[in-house]
């Protein structure tokens, strides 16, 4: 089977890491895999992580350009490759595929909770689908794609509830064997807490964790890996609460660094207000690290509620503090739960499981 993945860019991030891992895993399962990167925005280190058997095509579209030449190049490539399945990772790409035959074998994964309009009201969208590229939502044209996948039950349920579109859940996968494991040893006097995510507090909830650290006054040290538009706000908040010495911003770290160093911490916290899945939660579980996540979102789905981690009331600093204090004083229980979570995540969220399910669905739905 020949599979083509189409992606906008390739920079450090959870979705990009997932794309590399799935492409590599599909090759290992004897598929012929091509990856088309449209924008001239990619990281050479990430490109080198593709299996040598994965064929990567760089379109080199300049960011912000109004040129449409990249559409011609992409379609020529697709005709030349003659794939059995085209897997797009943004629904807006669907209308850029000209061949009706190729459109019939196209699938899309919704990588986050749905937002925006499926069918923009402006009449120009009907005649100029290229305008869909500038739509800020993530569901434009998704109702026309033959096969729709959702990364979690939370995403599937909201896509059905808000847009009446059915989808099949295929959980995102991680390379579980690449993560160093935390030893089953007690923590020190101070609990070292880590969060790995873009710094977008309105969605990811980093401000909740900073406020919790202020309440706990020295019981925890918090490290944030990642960068984003909220960094200045979060640094200012830490200063205003007079807890700069308990908060550390490491910035963006490579996937290899994360896989090597998650095990250095005592607790992983994902306090997202709105989150479709929670790939970094699975990574923490693969590191044998106790995890604490917000309720009612994708991360709590990954932990099966309190079965493989702890859950606090979404948006509540008080409950976040309460759960951290409980884990702090019952750390033997936390380590025991982390051991069970490690086995569960390897069986459920390893990328080999994800890749195999995608290949089976391509064949079944074609």
Describe each region flagged by the PLM.
Residues 5-21, 25-67, 160, 228-230:
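N-terminal strand-loop element at the rim of the active site
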Residues 16-21, 191, 198-215, 229-235:
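A conserved mid-protein helix/loop that constitutes part of the nucleotide-sugar donor-binding site
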Residues 75-76, 127-147:
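Membrane-proximal helix-turn-helix segments that form the acceptor-binding/catalytic region
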Residues 88-94, 110:
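Short His-centered aromatic/hydrophobic patch
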Residues 139-181, 192:
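Donor nucleotide-sugar binding/catalytic pocket of nucleotide-sugar-dependent glycosyltransferases
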Residues 273:
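Aromatic "clamp/platform" in nucleotide-sugar-dependent glycosyltransferases that forms part
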Residues 290-293:
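Short hydrophobic beta-strand element within catalytic cores of glycosyltransferases
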Residues 305-306, 310-317, 326-331:
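Conserved acidic donor-binding segment of nucleotide-sugar-dependent glycosyltransferases
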């Amino acid at each position: 089977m020949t599979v083509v993945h189409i992606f906008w860019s390739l920079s450090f991030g959870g979705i990009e890491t997932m794309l590399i891992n799935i492409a590599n895993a599909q090759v290992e399962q004897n598929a012929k895999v091509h990856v088309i990167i449209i924008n001239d925005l990619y990281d050479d280190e990430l490109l080198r992580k593709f299996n040598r058997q994965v064929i990567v095509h760089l379109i080199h579209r300049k960011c912000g350009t109004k040129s449409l030449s990249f559409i011609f190049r992409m379609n020529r490539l697709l005709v030349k490759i003659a794939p059995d399945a085209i897997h797009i990772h943004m629904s807006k790409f669907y209308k850029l595929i000209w061949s009706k035959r190729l459109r019939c074998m196209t699938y899309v994964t919704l990588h986050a909770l749905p937002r925006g309009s499926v069918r923009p009201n402006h009449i120009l969208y009907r005649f100029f689908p290229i305008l869909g590229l500038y739509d800020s939502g993530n569901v434009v044209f998704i109702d026309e794609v033959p096969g729709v996948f959702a990364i979690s039950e939370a995403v599937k349920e909201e896509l059905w509830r808000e847009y009446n579109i059915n989808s099949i859940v295929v959980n995102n996968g991680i390379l579980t064997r690449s993560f160093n494991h935390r030893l089953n040893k007690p923590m020190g006097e101070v609990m070292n807490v880590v969060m790995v995510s873009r710094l977008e507090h309105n969605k990811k909830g980093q401000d909740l964790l900073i406020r919790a650290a202020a309440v706990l006054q020295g019981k925890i040290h918090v490290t944030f890996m990642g960068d984003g538009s909220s960094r200045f706000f979060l640094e200012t908040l830490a200063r205003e609460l007079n807890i700069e010495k308990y908060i550390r911003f490491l910035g963006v770290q490579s996937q290899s660094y994360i896989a090597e160093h998650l095990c250095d911490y005592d607790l992983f916290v994902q306090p997202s207000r709105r989150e479709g899945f929670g790939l970094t939660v699975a990574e923490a579980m693969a590191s044998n690290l106790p995890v604490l996540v917000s309720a009612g979102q994708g991360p709590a789905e990954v932990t099966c509620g309190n079965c493989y981690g702890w859950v606090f009331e979404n948006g509540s600093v008080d409950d976040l503090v309460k759960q951290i204090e409980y884990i702090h004083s019952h750390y033997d229980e936390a380590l025991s739960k982390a051991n069970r979570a490690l086995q569960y995540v390897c069986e459920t969220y390893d990328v080999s499981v994800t890749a195999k399910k995608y290949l089976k669905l391509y064949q079944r739905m074609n």
